[in-house]
Amino acid sequence: MLRKGTERAYSHVTFSGDGTQLASVGSAPDYMLTVWDWKSEKVILRAKAFSQDIFRVAFSPYVEGQLITSGTGHIRFWKMASTFTGLKLQGDIGKFGQLELSDVSGFAELPDGKVLCGTEYGTLLLWEGNLVKAQLVGEGEEDTPLHQGMIEVVLLEGGTAQAPEVVLTAGADGFIRTWDFFEIDNAESDETPNVVISLKKEQRVVASNGEPAYIVDLVKGNDHWLV
């Protein structure tokens, strides 16, 4: 049993890639990020993740000792860093720059260390370090969103872990959309942060009442997807 990770409730938990560690984030009032040796039921590291709600935590699939948290008006990039006083969690807050702050739910780390996240405005942000490298928008008028409303899911698919082929996104509008990974990974912005990307394909998911489904997660099975 894992105790004292947060005062009231956990908002999200996840395992490391090798399954040896567990990361949890708590809700109000403490908003704690805790990394556990879950088999030994011991806390390895803990730190206050943010001052508002945290939706998600994930270990880096590529670099040991790195994590990402996101939630209300923020995304934060963490390292388990060796200091003079021992191992500590150090977190860099993502700086939105000239872009409007956004809640962040879905995100994915790319093999080269950049991070791709969704926004509540239906765009994607490409991060390099804790700075926005580009805001990805759709074809059409300026600032055309890729989705209507919050993007809850950002996944890398196809190819291999080191060389994915596509990015899948989904969220509030009920659409699952597919984008070219190479086009996103190589996006470069000029005078404005916006970079237009092209839609490869899409699938609309409808709820039992006929309305668009609000998609909060996609889980891949052997021969199917669970939405």
Question: What are these model-derived regions, one by one?
Answer:
Residues 25-29, 70-72, 118-121, 170-173:
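Conserved strand-to-loop turn within each blade of WD40 beta-propeller repeats
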Residues 7-15, 52-59, 99-109, 148-159, ...:
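Canonical WD40 repeat/beta-propeller blade segments in eukaryotic WD-repeat proteins
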Residues 1-37, 52:
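Tandem repeat protein-protein interaction scaffolds
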Residues 31-33, 65, 73, 122, ...:
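Repetitive beta-architecture junctions, highlighting loop-to-beta-strand starts
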Residues 22, 66-67, 115, 167, ...:
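Hydrophobic beta-strand positions that form the internal "hydrophobic ladder"
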Residues 79-86, 130-134, 180-190:
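Short loop/turn segments immediately following beta-strands, especially the blade-tip
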Residues 1-5, 43-49, 88-98, 134-146, ...:
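Short C-terminal beta-strands that terminate individual repeats in beta-propeller domains
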Residues 33-37, 57, 76-81, 124-128, ...:
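WD40-repeat beta-propellers
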